[in-house]
Each structure stands twice: as C-alpha cells, then as structure tokens.
Amino acid sequence: AGYIYVIAHIRGGSFLGYNWYLDGKMSNKINTFKDFIRCAEYLGDESNKYCDPKKIVIEGRSAGGLLIGAVTVMRPDLFWITIPGVPFVDVMNTMSDSKIPLTTEEWTQWGNPNEQEGYNNIREYCPYTNVKENHYPNMYCTAGLHDPRVPYWEIMKLIAKIREYKKDNNIQMIRIETEQG
C-alpha cells in the first residue's frame, strides 16, 4: 500500500532547456500531451510494476489544467481520477476571440486558430473540441468565478459535454471558488 508521486518533465516546459520548451510549443504542442500519455502508459504498464493502471490520478492547474483536460479526453482509459484546476480547456474558442484579454499575446504560444495552421494544431489537442462518446474517468475540477484569464465557463462547458457523451457512471464534479480570480 502507499503511493508514488511523479513529476513528468514533458516537452513544452523549460526544465530541460530552451529546445525542450520549443519542442512543445505552437505546431509542436501536441508533443506535450503525447509525452504525458507515454509517462502514464509506462507507469501503468504491468511489467514495470510501478502502479495499478486503474489507480492513476493526475493533477494540473491553468495551462497544466489544459494538459490534464487534453489527456483526459485523448486517453481516458489511462486514468482513474483527473483533477484539472482552473483549466484552459476551450483553447479553440478562446484563442479565436482577439477581444479576450491576452489572446493575441498567447498566439505565440498556442497558435492563432483564425489561420489554418493554428486551427489544425489546436484542433488536435483542444479538450472541448475533441470530446466524443467514450468512458471518462472521475474528475474533480476547480475554477474561479472572477478569473479573468481562465473563465469558469470553460470547465463547465467541458464537463457538460463529457456528461453528454460519456458511457459510464463515473463522476465529474466542479467546484467554483466564488472569491477567487
């Protein structure tokens, strides 16, 4: 009995240098999610004996919440519980609206979905865009009612869509912090 705590240094983070960061940015953003999925697959591989694949719990906040939301939708079979905190999960719609604060500045990180290449890249990993009929893990999500950067309705839209398409009885919960943001 016990637990294992793992930190995955996936591409897009700068811990392993500038090139590692660039390998997870813009048209390479999908690498971030693929790296995380590979880590989860490795941990849950029965031959490694690290953990029961049905008991993997993952957590991330803000842009890390995007990571958690994306891998939840891409490979829901890998996780028992996912905890996206104030997650940026409707990348396509948010990045399409240049009137939202910081959007145009963030195009250098995520891409501009108003251009074909940016659209194609974001389409590949945007959690909200990619929900389909599937079995989804239990989810505990948080958002700040007054958060100007990651509005609470992004996670509410995602959870509503997952509930519409899910083929299981797992629970998706949202906690809205009314004093946060």
Q: What does each model-found stretch correspond to?
A:
Residues A1, I7-G181:
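Active-site-proximal cap/loop segments of hydrolase catalytic domains
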